[in-house]
Amino acid sequence: MSLLAQLDQKIAANGGLIVSCQPVPDSPLDKPEIVAAMALAAEQAGAVAIRIEGVANLQATRAVVSVPIIGIVKRDLEDSPVRITAYIEDVDALAQAGADIIAIDGTDRPRPVPVETLLARIHHHGLLAMTDCSTPEDGLACQKLGAEIIGTTLSGYTTPETPEEPDLALVKTLSDAGCRVIAEGRYNSPAQAADAMRHGAWAVTVGSAITRLEHICQWYNTAMKKAVL
């Protein structure tokens, strides 16, 4: 049975939650062994897949979880706004570390390596390709190039202002066009994740609301301070 077929079964049984275990950089939680522990806890709680950034984190996580891992490498480039898995070497390193799915930036922005080249390299390793997109045009272009999974990950992050709510309209548009959509980006409550599924998402990735303790504390602190002002 193919990995996609296995995921279809798991999503039908468990609801389609993917947990992104990416601690705040330099946080006390930003250690491979802690990332792996969070991933294992998420798997035991019913997550159908895990999203991991960085080769060391992926290696540590691969050793303890059996669910599929979506691997990425983030870089801050001087000559490109693209941050997610920008190089062939990143794809190779993630494949070697045990990723099942490799996600790349799928936006139409200047980049060191074309999207189609990165997709071909992912498929060379026999892995599934996911593209993190920001618009319907991005997603449909990546689907035509052969990406098996389209993420709404970058919606709201390629524009001057980032909205507070997730982009459900993008989920629906891509789903209606026949894409296998992972809704991602600002899904900070179970209700929002459920809305994404109702709008046609194949699965939903949740990160900050589950694995970024600093963000969660900030949300509570902000709300509570407002209540007493």
From Swiss-Prot:
GO terms for molecular function: N-acylglucosamine-6-phosphate 2-epimerase activity. InterPro entries: Aldolase_TIM, NanE, RibuloseP-bd_barrel. Gene3D superfamilies: Aldolase class I. It catalyses: an N-acyl-D-glucosamine 6-phosphate = an N-acyl-D-mannosamine 6-phosphate. Pfam families: NanE (PF04131). One of its GO terms (biological process) is N-acetylmannosamine catabolic process. Pathway: Amino-sugar metabolism; N-acetylneuraminate degradation; D-fructose 6-phosphate from N-acetylneuraminate: step 3/5. Keywords: Carbohydrate metabolism, Isomerase. Its EC number is 5.1.3.9. One of its GO terms (cellular component) is cytosol. Belongs to the NanE family. NCBIfam families: PRK01130.1. Converts N-acetylmannosamine-6-phosphate (ManNAc-6-P) to N-acetylglucosamine-6-phosphate (GlcNAc-6-P). This is Putative N-acetylmannosamine-6-phosphate 2-epimerase. It comes from Escherichia fergusonii (strain ATCC 35469 / DSM 13698 / CCUG 18766 / IAM 14443 / JCM 21226 / LMG 7866 / NBRC 102419 / NCTC 12128 / CDC 0568-73). The lineage of its organism: Bacteria, Pseudomonadati, Pseudomonadota, Gammaproteobacteria, Enterobacterales. The gene is nanE.
